[in-house]
Amino acid sequence: MGAKPTIIFATSNGIGMGHLARATAIAKALAPNAEPVIVSMASAVAEIPSAFGIRCEYLPGENRGWTSRSKWDLYIRDRIVALIDETDAKVLVFDGVIPHAGFIAARNARPQVKLVWMRRGLWQKKVHRFALPLQSAAMDYVIEPGDYAFAYDHGPTSKRKEAIRTAPVSLYQAAEALNREESRKALGLDQNRPAVLVQLGTGADDANEKMTAALRGLIGWPELQVVLTKEPIDKNGKSLAPEGLDLKVIKYFPLAKVLAAFDAGVCATGYNGVHELLAAKLPTVLVSNIRGMDDQEARAKWCHDFGYALRANQADLNNITETVRELQDPNMRASLSFKCAELPAPIGGEEIANKLLKIADEPAKTVSLSQRTRYLALRYIAIAYHQIAKEKSQAPINSVKVVFSDSADANELGTNIRSGVRFEQFFHGSSDKYRAVRHQIADTYYGK
């Protein structure tokens, strides 16, 4: 048997952790038979090396402002080409709504690599849908990870025929999850008091109001421990939590492993949350985030209509409070948990891993003139879109020294990623030649 093939996963930084979580779940399933590498624009990539032993690199998104928009696709191209050359990768998998032109250019530069788009369904009908035919045609394969709410998908991807559909993908796997006692010990929770996990975003005014409304619905639950993954505060540091709650902010990755610690959950209706919490049979209230391309309301309606979760009206703060309050009823919690036991196991990670292994063994394809033309079209469409939309990004950094690191420590990586400096990460164990190339890339796009 030959050496295990390298498969690169590249993910965008969406709302939530769905893209990175899917890539990680598939990479875990691949690990016995392949060498997965994850490059991600999500800051949570800092957690992956120490949690799973998977090689990872942070890839700054265009919104960081570390180089101009016109150069960013070329920077992505050169980063991915260098990684392909270092690892002799056979497949490049992109998980995100928009397959950026830089990834397509990298495959065009290294045509021996097969390009796969991991394209989640349930798109909202927004302007991005018009690029779907062009984007899909630039791929060697399109794989659609299954969604419990697939029957309610009436978006633009639901009409397309090129995708290979699989079972849902999730970091939650029953065989790997800790039991209730172990989970509570790992999180430092009281073994005898009820606990609720609240995973809602904050930042924008409407998101802050939803957080407060949800927390208000937990008031009156005797001896309750309210568990959050970040402090419930607004941009000015003001608490969003009403008085009378025992709040505990935890840091644990992956949370999918310790969901048995909780009696109920309140979360956004993203792909990741639904396919972890419901797969774990956790009684859940869903509060949709309507930003972005993910049709969270369609997913929430399906879960509610068939009795798998409670859907709060995200536009009605009083309804959010009252719906969350229903979780205080033990009969309601028992009913939701019992119903979730009917859901199929999220085994899509293993399915996709097996498909990628077969793709890795396929002979290289020739990159056609039409594919190269599609790359140019997508690149200039993206630049024009950003100029028209004037999407907010951080102010460009022109004179800050670049920080290089090969650390796999989650705290160190997280600090560097969140800092105001340009941060270039090498995966641990990379060669001196690769590091020299990466320095050259940084000099080219950031300046010396």
Question: Locations of the language-model features?
Answer:
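Short N-terminal targeting/anchoring amphipathic segment
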Residues: V81-P99
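A nucleotide-sugar donor-handling region in carbohydrate enzymes
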Residues: R120, Q124-V127, Q135-T202
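Donor-nucleotide binding loops and adjacent catalytic segments primarily
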Residues: E181-A264
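Acidic donor-binding loop of glycosyltransferase active sites
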Residues: A260-G273, L282
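Catalytic binding pocket for nucleotide-activated donors in carbohydrate/polymer assembly enzymes
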Residues: G273-T321
